Amino acid sequence: MICFPLDNTEYEAKDMGAYLGTRTRGVFSAEGNFAVTPAENGLAVKVSPGLAWLKRDLYWGVAVLLESEIMLPLEIADGELERIDVIVCRLDKVANKSEVVVKKGEFSGSPVFAQPQRDDNYDEIYLASVMIQAGATGITKADISSLLLNEDYCGLMRDGVTGIPTEAIQEQATALFNGLYEQLQGRADELEQVLEGIV
């Protein structure tokens, strides 16, 4: 059984991983953290420094720190079809390392990208998607869509067993408000009928 931290006790990586195990996948913030921007020239993007969390397994979380900006080249565009590449922060469980890479999309008239890989080999979050226009020789800001706040692909890390279900809470609050409104409207109609009877 792991108990962390205790005095005079030696620990392994999996023990610290258990400490990080309740943190959700995602980035530290969406403000300049793992920001993806066009390179000055050619088919390439830049990724700013950032801090993120990934999962080795259910009870083993890892922190990933990119300390300095990197540049990622993108493969050549097609002359007629488009594709969407994805900028991925991932844990390579087989090689025992983290990395930021380009996941190349398929050429298509209506391109889409696949879901993040989260299995025995990799754990991934998507930082941004990059539209590679037909015949493109460079990347613009309009070609890049940040995925940092999209919880299907990335999201902000939260410390807890589960994130706060804000959408469900909003739906419950709306249903409660609508129910109260209908009740009050019914009472108002009854009061109006009573007053009409008195007058």
What function would you assign to each model-found segment?
Residues M1-Y59, E69:
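N-terminal "first-domain core" detector
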Residues P5-Y11, G50-V194, I198:
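Beta-strand-rich solenoidal segments
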